[in-house]
Swiss-Prot record:
GO terms for cellular component: plasma membrane. Belongs to the resistance-nodulation-cell division (RND) (TC 2.A.6) family. MdtC subfamily. The keyword Transmembrane helix applies. GO terms for molecular function: xenobiotic transmembrane transporter activity. The gene is mdtC. Keywords: Cell inner membrane, Cell membrane, Membrane, Transmembrane, Transmembrane helix, Transport. It holds the Pfam family ACR_tran. Part of a tripartite efflux system composed of MdtA, MdtB and MdtC. MdtC forms a heteromultimer with MdtB. This is Multidrug resistance protein MdtC. Induction: The mdtABC operon is transcriptionally activated by BaeR. InterPro entries: AcrB_DN_DC_subdom, Acrflvin-R, Multidrug-R_MdtC. It comes from the Bacteria.
Length: 1025
């Protein structure tokens, strides 16, 4: 007894099996996490080190390079980049996908320990690391504002109480607090008052350090008691420092308040944060590479009431940005698309069968197959994301195909008068091999995807497995539940048609008759069809070469990031004004809901902005259209540029850039790099294929270069250390003492009062006390002159690097930009000492481009092997695969028509078409072979009869797949930019394939049959292999 006969005669067992599959799927669905895309984040670790006051070049040579040499030995590091700026170095390590982030972190700590002896002794702390990618957009931004508390106090609450608590939440990788710095006592010195009193800056520093100490004092005890000794050795507020005696002049006490202004302020006054034009402290939260964004955001939201309770009521804690609403909205759109696809597919079945009872059968088979897939997704550790749900949407057309083929064949026997159970057995027996061939060959398409490495392979694996599982369950259902329901539900008579549907039935009959007549003509003009087939192959090649290409569709996530790049010599005050101006322009745009931003720190001429757009339903423009509109307004702001880009769910690399794509220049000759980078950047800025061209090379910062006269210094009794200490004391925001509090430690910061450092003449007021106690002006032994200096020094590996970032103008693709850059580099004649290569997402695009054709060929070869094994033939698989060229032409023409570039999503569509369109040929070839074996028909008679008999199921399966994909094309709202390329590719390919393969497949079948007979050792045998 055949396998499926067991289920036909045991309906209860079959029903319970289907119920079990459905219940497991429902349970899996409830337990599946939610995400925008499959987990494709590279493991990234950021190492930070600081040496206050050190120049970028000093940080690069003395801090970055020793660390890089040690970190570069770690196994699994795929990319190492560093950026050194004033007083700080940051090294980004990107690891291979299969590298465990926790194991990598242990190796990073060991490498830091190994390099410790090579680092400068003056570093205030050891280098630290974080398991987060600083280039990723925050998953959530919290803001603190208050009308009563200062920015320093707000920063203290944020960094001391909120950030540590949030960091402990599962999934949180890093909490970056910006907008100010910790509270501090600031000592603003008056150089003239110091000179008048004969007090040096070192005297002030030493006096303050000696007056604020925290040392153990011991204890007193007798035979029965013990007394702990406690002194007032600490000064904690500006008021306590004000009367501090720092010197005696002619017997009179010189107090700190006599020569300085002492205030309760912050450690670094060159920091500013804002939200919607109001000063604010920002908590920018990033997730761990392996964390789920929705679960992490939900966990943070659940803790917000607790967090609010830990800070005073006068402080307002708000969510300024949250990535999760647009992700949820996108997934809801996909779920609605899935439901619409199921409804349309069932409608197609009903129109063709014109029987409510018969339609119930695939209407049951489809949900069982789709719902059952959720169980496998859970067991595989997948998530409900845009790609996995799109896989199920597309699977709707596939899973109904198997049921349609079985159902249609059984219905044909019923209409011929056969009894239901007998028809179920006979019909399933006839098409069982066909259904198996269709399903296995479709799954075979995805085998190369499962073996594909890198980011594309990780991204597509979840899609491929989800679809394959759905097809596998569909195969089981179509050979068990479907024939059982047919045998017990359908009647042995022609179904009654509703009057409304008779017209459709007559139209279908007329269409079939017309097809038969046209097929006869085609079979008599096979050479013309051969020319058409060869033409489609050539057209495929031309279209693939010419179509614009990109890595991944540009997403509208509802969030924009903006990088501010101002003149390299700009002051902090001017930069803060630019931030406010830019925020006002953006805040006034009707599509903008919220704006936050900050500037300052080690790179005064840069800033960041995070813009939340209104929900998609409340605005008519896409994110890119909004960027285009804002770009024109922002260009009118002098002295600085704001580069906007839409936040994407996929971002590769650890570089913090002001645009979406990067091109990196490397050289072992720093001078050559600095010479050629401006030339290359200016050339690229003229290209129409690129927009927002900018660079991270900043080597024209304003510098005042002091030249010591060492002979004069020796004669005057002054050493270089004393002179450098003078400059650090005066202008370096030097942290000279620590104030210990129960919750945190705060600094005493000393510098010349900003009122006396407004111009270069401030240097003339500086003096050093020599070893004879005399005040020697700085101008006696030093000269100064303005010069240029780098604001940052960047490395990749151990080579000097400069990264040029760019966005794409509307209507341009990444392939256009890549080709234009390659041409520009060739035209410029860049020397071999300067090497250029794409980085980040652009690099992955280049790698994917090189493997796309190989992947498609591998998929076709895999299908050929599977079909060859199933048919025990070298020839028939070629007949079946002859359907592919027309599908490729239709897909590529549709993409051109909709002005959609060929992306990774479109590649998925092409792979799916390889599996879909061959189903038509499989049904034709199977019936033709059966007719030749058992009907004693000639090959031409057999294929002609097969085409007519299978016309209805071919139309049904094609229209089911087409209508299953059509909602993807027509869908709007959040995430539509991901769904539409897939739908366009499939619909275009199906339409063109259906028009041509109904005629080309019979012709190819006859061609190979004649070829087989010609080379056969037994030419008299007329039966095919």
């Amino acid at each position: 007894m055949k396998f499926f006969a067991l289920f036909i005669y045991r309906p209860v067992a079959t029903i319970l099996l289907s119920v079990a599959i459905t219940l497991c799927g429902i349970l899996g669905f409830r337990m599946l996490p939610v995400a925008p895309l499959p987990q494709v984040d590279f493991p990234v670790i950021m190492v930070s080190a600081s040496l206050p006051g050190a120049s970028p070049e000093t940080m690069a040579s003395s801090v970055a390079t020793p660390l890089e040499r040690s970190l570069g030995r770690i196994a699994g590091v795929s990319e190492m980049t560093s950026s050194s700026s004033l007083g700080s170095t940051r090294i980004i390590l990107q690891f291979d996908f299969d590298r465990d982030i926790n194991g990598a972190a242990r190796d990073v700590q060991a490498a830091i320990n190994a390099a410790q002896s090579l680092l400068p002794s003056g570093m205030p702390s050891r280098p630290t690391y974080r398991k987060a990618n600083p280039s990723d957009a925050p998953i959530m931004i919290l803001t603190l504002t208050s009308d009563t508390y200062s920015q320093g106090e707000l920063y203290d609450f944020a960094s001391t109480q909120l950030a540590p608590t949030i960091s402990q939440i599962d999934g949180v990788g890093d909490v970056d607090v910006g907008g100010s710095s910790l509270p501090a006592v600031r000592v603003g010195l008056n150089p003239q008052a110091l000179f008048n009193q004969g007090v040096s800056l070192d005297d002030v520093r030493t006096a303050i350090s000696n007056a604020n100490v925290r040392k153990p004092q011991g204890a007193l005890e007798d035979g029965t008691h013990r007394w702990q000794i406690q002194t007032n050795d600490e000064l904690k507020t500006a008021a306590e420092y004000q009367p501090l005696i720092i010197h005696y002049n002619n017997g009179g006490a010189v107090r700190l308040g006599d020569v300085a202004t002492v205030t309760d302020s912050v450690q670094d006054v060159r920091n500013a944060g804002m939200t919607n034009a109001k000063p604010a402290i920002l908590l920018m939260i990033r997730k761990l590479p392996e964390a789920n964004i929705i679960q992490t955001v939900d966990s943070i939201r659940a803790r917000l009431p607790e967090l609010q309770s830990t800070i005073p009521a006068a402080i307002d804690l708000q969510i300024a940005q949250d990535r999760s609403p647009t992700i949820r909205a996108s997934l809801e759109e996909v779920e609605q698309t899935l439901i619409i696809s199921v409804a349309l597919v069932i409608l197609v079945v009903f129109l063709f069968l014109r029987s409510g009872r018969a339609t119930i059968i695939p209407a049951v088979a489809v949900p069982v197959s789709l719902i059952g897939t959720f169980a496998a997704m859970y067991l595989c550790g997948f998530s409900l994301n845009n790609l996995s749900l799109m896989a199920l949407t597309i699977a709707t057309g596939f899973v109904v195909d198997d049921a349609i083929v079985v159902l249609e064949n059984i219905a044909r026997h019923l209409e011929a008068g056969m009894k239901p159970l007998q028809a179920a057995l006979q019909g399933t027996r006839e098409v069982g091999f066909t259904v198996l061939s269709m399903s296995l060959s479709l799954v075979a398409v995805f085998l190369p995807l499962l073996l594909m490495g890198g980011l594309p392979g990780r991204l597509l694996r979840e899609f491929a497995v989800t679809l394959s599982v759905a097809i596998g369950i569909s195969l089981l259902v179509s050979l068990t539940l479907t024939p059982m329901m047919c045998g017990w539900m359908l009647k042995a008579s022609k179904p009654r048609e509703q009057k409304r549907l008779r017209g459709f039935g007559r139209m279908l009959v007329a269409l079939q008759q017309g097809y038969g007549k046209s097929l006869k003509w085609v079979l008599n003009h096979t050479r013309l069809v051969g020319v058409v087939l060869l033409g489609t192959i050539a057209l495929n090649i031309w279209l693939y070469i010419s179509i614009p290409k990109t890595f991944f569709p540009e997403q509208d996530t509802g969030v924009l990031m903006g990088g501010i790049q101002a003149d390299q010599s700009i002051s902090f005050q001017a930069m803060r004004g630019k931030l406010q101006d830019f925020m006002k322009i953006i805040r006034d745009d009707p599509a903008v809901d919220n704006v936050t931003g900050f500037t300052g720190g080690s790179r005064v001429n840069s800033g960041m902005m995070f813009i939340t757009l209104k929900p998609r339903g409340e605005r008519s423009e896409t994110a890119q259209q909004i960027i285009d509109r804002l770009r024109k307004k922002l260009a009118k702001e002098p002295g600085a540029n704001l580069f906007l880009m839409a936040v994407q769910d996929i971002r590769v690399g650890g570089r913090q850039a002001n645009a979406s794509y990067q091109y990196t220049l490397l050289s072992d000759d720093l001078a050559a790099l600095r010479e050629w980078e401006p030339k290359i950047r200016k050339k690229l800025a003229t290209l129409p294929e690129l927009a927002d061209v900018n660079s991270d090379q900043e080597d024209n910062g304003a510098e005042m270069n002091l030249i010591y006269d060492r002979d004069t210094m020796a004669r005057l009794g002054i050493d270089v250390q004393a002179a450098n200490s003078l400059l650090n004391n005066a202008f370096g925001q030097r942290q000279i003492s620590t104030i210990y509090q129960p919750m945190n430690q705060y600094k005493v910061v000393m510098e010349v009062d900003p009122r006396y450092t407004q111009d270069i003449s401030a240097l003339e007021k500086m003096f050093v006390i020599n070893n004879e106690g005399k005040a020697i002006p700085l101008s006696y032994f030093a000269k100064w002159q303005p010069a240029n200096a780098p604001l940052s020094v960047n490395h990749q590996g151990l080579s000097a690097a400069s990264t040029i970032s760019f966005n794409l103008p509307t209507g341009k693709s990444l392939s256009d930009a890549s080709a234009a850059i390659d041409r520009a580099m060739t035209q410029l004649g860049v020397p071999s000492t300067v090497r250029g290569s794409f980085a980040g997402t652009a690099q992955v695009f280049q790698e994917t481009m090189n493997s796309q054709v190989i992947l498609i060929i591998a998929a076709i070869a895999t299908v050929y092997i599977v079909l060859g094994i199933l048919y025990e033939s070298y020839v028939h698989p070629l007949t079946i695969l002859s359907t592919l060229p027309s599908a490729g032409v239709g897909a590529l023409l549709a993409l051109e028509l909709f002005n959609a570039p060929f992306s990774l999503i479109a590649l998925i569509g092409i792979m799916l078409l390889i599996g879909i369109v061959k189903k038509n040929a499989i049904m034709m070839v199977d019936f033709a072979l059966e007719a030749q074996r058992h009907g004693n028909l000639t090959p031409q008679e057999a294929i002609f009869q097969a085409c007519l008999l299978r016309f209805r199921p071919i139309m049904m399966t094609t229209l089911a797949a087409l209508f299953g994909a059509l909602p993807l094309v027509l869908s709007g709202g959040d995430g539509s930019e991901l769904r539409q390329p897939l739908g366009i590719t499939i619909v275009g390919g199906l339409v063109m394939s259906q028009l041509l393969t109904l005629y080309t497949t019979p012709v190819v079948y006859l061609f190979f049959d004649r070829l087989r007979l010609r080379f056969s050792r037994k030419p008299k045998q007329a039966v095919t292999e």
